[in-house]
A protein has these predicted regions:
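Juxtacatalytic substrate-recognition/specificity segment
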Residues: 69, 118-169
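Intrinsically disordered, low-complexity Pro/Gly/Ser/Thr-rich segments with frequent PxxP/GP/PP motifs
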Residues: 1-10
Length: 169
């Protein structure tokens, strides 16, 4: 593969998801919090693959990738993600979700019996969060989130995707 060229590879595989007992990421009795659970190419810079220590889940050195995920969950379960839902189908037992995202290094995916997330829409981005703070009401929280989004845009630039998840692990 020469510089500037690209290649499409499609992989179908089963992933073994760990318990969330130690890191908060994985599965528990009635929910899953999935982050960095998929195969992804390493970033290639300066004629070498970027290495990372894998000492922390947050230090992964992925290359930009496009993702297509199909997921089938029981009817009473909710799915929250920062990917785009391109299609959703239900039958008498389950709901199938078809999700996609382009030019991403990672994504988050939450499957819960009852969603713990609240959606806040800004003029710039949709924020899905399950952070709890009983000291402020939902309207105040929406105003604060909108101010943070605009501050971040002015200081570091526009977030490159239309949705973001902020989760309490």
């Amino acid at each position: 593969l020469l510089p500037g060229e690209n290649l499409t590879i499609q992989l179908n595989y089963l992933a073994k998801i760990p318990s969330d007992r130690f890191t908060g990421i994985g599965y528990s009795a009635k929910k899953m919090n999935l982050k960095n659970w998929f195969l992804s190419p390493a970033r290639y810079e300066n004629h070498a693959f970027t290495k990372n220590s894998n000492a922390n889940l947050e230090d992964i050195a992925n290359a930009l990738s496009s993702f297509e995920v199909s997921l089938k969950v029981p009817l009473n379960y909710a799915v929250t993600t920062d990917l785009i839902a391109t299609k959703k189908e239900s039958d008498s037992n389950a709901t199938s979700y078809f999700l996609s995202g382009n030019n991403r290094t990672d994504f988050s995916l939450f499957v819960e019996e009852k969603s713990s997330f609240t959606n806040y829409k800004s003029d710039l981005i949709d924020i899905h969060t399950n952070l709890k703070d009983n000291a402020i009401d939902p309207i105040q929280k929406a105003i604060i989130i909108d101010r943070i989004v605009h501050f971040a845009k002015n200081e570091i630039g526009l977030y490159p995707h239309t949705k973001i998840t902020v989760a309490q692990s």
